[in-house]
Amino acid sequence: SRGLGDVYKRQHLDIQWFLSNVSDPEQIVAYITECTLAELRTIYADQLPPEVSTVPDALSRIKEATGQKFVIIIDEWDVLIRDEASNQKIQDDYINFLRGMFKGTEPTKYIQLAFLTGILPIKKLKTQSALNNFHQYSMLNPGPLASYIGFTEDEVSALCQKYGQNFEEVRRWYDGYLLGNYHVY
């Protein structure tokens, strides 16, 4: 069976990592762009001429050259919304970055799927106009992702057996949540 990586290119952005490694937080979007373009140029040197200066342009050109769309994973997408809430420049730059990545129909030509993790709800933020085409799932509303949020009871039971732990004791310690029809930990 073919995995996701066999069909689509992947691009992972860990926003907390970028924030932790940038020398000046006000340059975070430029740093994300610079690092992402450097990584893409390493892999797709023939498809990215020097004048390519934005991530969306790079992804579009790679898709044109290879025919393959991307799966975009942005881990802790909301860290700049939370940690830099008082810095309007960072907020504006980041929202414009997200808008460039996801707004409108153009990104659908080179992005097959975008998966953003975070603790803040997308639709209730000022980013709504930048991120209004996402389906939002959470622990309170897991939808079809219920079995992927946390560990299912069957997975915890199997791990307990594998590592010689008492399942009932682990169950009492962690209690878990009921998401849809799934008991998760």
What are these regions (language model features)?
Residues 3-8:
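Short, small-residue-biased leader/transition segments that mark boundaries at the very start
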Residues 19-24, 80-82, 123-129:
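Switch/connector loops and helix/strand junctions flanking conserved nucleotide-binding motifs
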Residues 44-60:
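Short glycine-rich substrate-engagement loop in P-loop NTPases that contacts/grips substrate
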Residues 61-63, 92-112:
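Substrate-engagement module of ASCE P-loop NTPases
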Residues 126-132, 137-185:
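Amphipathic alpha-helical segments of the small helical/lid subdomains adjacent to P-loop NTPase cores
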